[in-house]
Regions:
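Short, Lys/Arg-enriched, disordered terminal segments
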Residues: 1-3, 306-307
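ABC transporter nucleotide-binding domains
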Residues: 3-8, 13-189, 194-208, 212-214
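Alpha-helix N-cap/helix-start and coil->helix boundary motif
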Residues: 12, 96, 120, 194, ...
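Generic alpha-helical secondary structure signal
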Residues: 74, 112-115, 125, 170, ...
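Generic structural signal for individual residues within well-ordered alpha-helical segments
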Residues: 77, 99-100, 115-118, 170, ...
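Non-catalytic alpha-helical coupling and interface elements of nucleotide-dependent molecular machines
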Residues: 104-107, 302-306
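ABC transporter nucleotide-binding domain
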Residues: 174-263
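Short, charged/small-residue-rich alpha-helical element at the C-terminal edge
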Residues: 227-300, 307
Length: 307
């Protein structure tokens, strides 16, 4: 088991009577990408702010590299790079000039750090374009460059692909993956885009209304997705009688009045279809259905799902 880099215990943030985050227990392991997945307003940004000491928790604990965050900020935070909402860049300066100011404030003396960070996110080092002239995607790239400029061990990135076009999303996904695989970085990202989290993360935490519903590796989460056989027949009532005779136990359900769902078949599907036909039933479909991550997300949140 990998070392735990971030651990929270019963982490809670309450505004008045409203709990933005409730008793959150997350575990981010060294050298892996953890995707915190949830709809807008689910509590992702608030969680990340508490992990960085930007907002105090109402209750609960945050530990980073095994050390409690309160009282150890000066030791821990320099080892972390973050993107939370939009950094305060100067509109009348270029991207490079903005990074130079932040580098000076941090006491960063590596002369190549700025150029390397810009190259990593696909922005030119000698570009004369002012920040005010940047597109939303370019602004997001510059924010990520700021997060990685000091070569941190841990990255905490809130919605890092926000504002990017499909090509930009693929590029950001690629260099985030490379930061983990090639440079050994530990990375926590948040997103409301399930498909992107599934392509990028090793481990996933599903958060909804401030509550962590699931925390699993991507492999284990995919294994939890349901798999069943769906039959479409001319008469579901008669088909149910056939299944009762074959299975001798309640392993199926009628869906929408037109379909039968069989969760586990001890009898071969071909034999079931044959039995239907022998009883004079028309079988227009006998298909194995595998639940997608989107379907799983809908099921565990009881909601409409996300992108």
């Amino acid at each position: 088991m990998s070392e735990i880099v971030i651990e929270t215990k019963q982490l809670t943030k309450q505004y008045g009577t409203q709990k933005s985050v409730a008793k959150l227990n997350i575990h981010v392991r060294r050298g892996r990408i953890y995707g915190l997945l949830g709809r807008n307003g689910a509590g992702k940004t608030t969680t990340m702010k508490m992990l960085l000491g930007l907002t105090p928790p109402t209750s609960g604990e945050v530990a980073i590299w095994g050390k409690p965050l309160p009282g150890n900020e000066k030791k821990l935070l320099p080892r972390i790079g973050s993107l939370i909402e939009s950094p305060g860049f100067y509109p009348n300066l270029t991207g490079t000039e903005n990074l130079r100011i932040f580098a000076a404030l941090r006491g960063l003396k590596n002369q190549n750090a700025i150029q390397s960070a810009l190259e990593l996110v696909g922005l030119p080092y000698r570009d004369k374009k002012l920040f005010s002239q940047y597109s939303l995607g370019m602004k997001q790239r510059l924010a990520i460059a700021l997060a990685v400029m000091h070569d941190p061990e841990l990255l905490i990135l809130d919605e890092p692909i926000n504002g990017l076009d499909p090509i930009g999303i693929a590029e950001v996904r690629s260099f985030i993956r490379a930061l983990c695989d090639e440079r050994g970085k530990t990375i926590l990202i948040s997103s409301h885009i399930l498909s992107e989290v599934a392509l990028l993360a090793d481990d996933i935490g599903i958060i909804d209304h401030g509550v962590l519903l699931e925390e699993e590796s991507l492999v284990d989460l995919e294994a939890k997705s349901e798999r069943y056989v769906r039959f479409t027949v001319s008469d579901t009532e008669r088909a149910a009688e056939v299944l009762n005779g074959l299975l001798h136990e309640n392993q199926f359900a009628v869906q929408d009045g037109h379909h039968l769902r069989l969760d586990s078949a001890k009898v071969p599907v071909a034999k079931i279809v044959s039995a239907f036909v022998q009883r004079g039933l028309e079988v227009s479909e006998a298909a194995t259905v595998e639940e997608s991550l989107e379907d799983y997300f809908k099921r565990v949140t009881g909601g409409e799902g996300i992108a």
